[in-house]
Amino acid sequence: MTVTTKQEWYLEYDITINRPGLLGDVSSLLGMMGINIVTINGIEEGRRGLLIKTDNLEKVKRFESIVHEIDDITITKLREPELRDRLAVRHGRYIEQDATDKKTFRFEREDLGLLVDFMAELFKENEHKLIGIRGMPRVGKTESIVAASVCAHKRWLFISSTLIKQTVRSSLIKGEYDADHVYIIDGAVTARESNQKHQDLVKEVMKLPSIKVVEHPDLFVETSEYEMRDFDYIIELRENKDQEIQY
């Protein structure tokens, strides 16, 4: 028996004429063409996003050509889904991404659920990543990292931290060296720590083929051999969009 592999696509469209039954008509058209809807959600005002699945790219192209003749909707995106697309359908909004620095993403405290989901998806990819997270004290940085680790079924280890009490590790035991762990470094604590054993441990951890999350990355790079360009992702977390992150 031959099993046909189906591929997912992300479809997003603007609603130009918001009439009753529009969503049903779009769904019916997809079904008639043999395209399955995996997930659907409103993406901000007047826009919908769908994850669709089909075994034939030609079906997607035919759907697109038919929709071009319809005045009610305008397709804005039709592509293989990116992580931001999947999260947008899941949460009903896009993550804010810096216009010039594409590896920088911005969140507000009310977006903690979206932030945790975003980081958890990054953690699940099971490959080396260096992630920096900026934010003022008590905005939810550490809690978000821990929550994302739990969601991704990863064990987390504090190399340096101020959560509950100040933690400064100078060594790890055998079971704590694991590519499946998430290592958390408070860049502010590490930057002012004079214990050479701690600094040596940080260098060792940074070379591990695992996920490292550095809080206050700007302070971390000031006293280390690393630069901001070494980070794969930079996350900024604020109480509100107007809050300035200052050190």
For the regions a language model picked out, list residue spans one by one.
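Short, aromatic/basic amphipathic alpha-helical patches
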Residues: 62-67, 148, 223-228
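Conserved nucleotide-sensing/catalytic segment adjacent to the nucleotide-binding pocket
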Residues: 156-218
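Glycine-rich phosphate-binding P-loop
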Residues: 127-160
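A conserved regulatory-domain signal marking ACT and ACT-like small-molecule sensing domains
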Residues: 1-113, 121
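Hydrophobic, well-structured mid-protein blocks that either form specific transmembrane helices
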Residues: 113-126, 132
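Short, well-ordered alpha-helical microsegments
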Residues: 23, 60, 141-142, 220-223
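Hydrophobic beta-strand segments of well-ordered beta-sheets in folded domains
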Residues: 38, 49-51, 129-131, 179-186, ...
